[in-house]
């Protein structure tokens, strides 16, 4: 697992967490294509000029339908896609197996179960937090290198 900046067709950066298939327990094919790695957005995506990006300390995109999220992610260029159910579940099982189940923003900017864990809220966000602004306990692996915000927000 590593963090990597990957650029979309517009040349804009996304911060991604990159895994080998074996690290996630996933096959080496995705949508019928052979893959050496899975790149998963490190942060909840924000919208910039109507395009989703994985960047820290941004307002997360909200009120988007599943179909619209698929379209937006695929608009970034070849190979870009909305996280699949298999990828999401694999991250969850990884956290479970490694005893790092993430907490998150479940109580207006803080964790309900650990209120000392807080993120940065923003005006008009109704208790939502800026992407990546929470502590490492909000990441899938409990480190600064993990996928953020799998719980809450």
Stretches found by the model and what they are:
Residues 1-34, 80:
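GGW-centered surface loops in extracellular recognition modules
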Residues 26-150:
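Short aromatic-cysteine micro-motif
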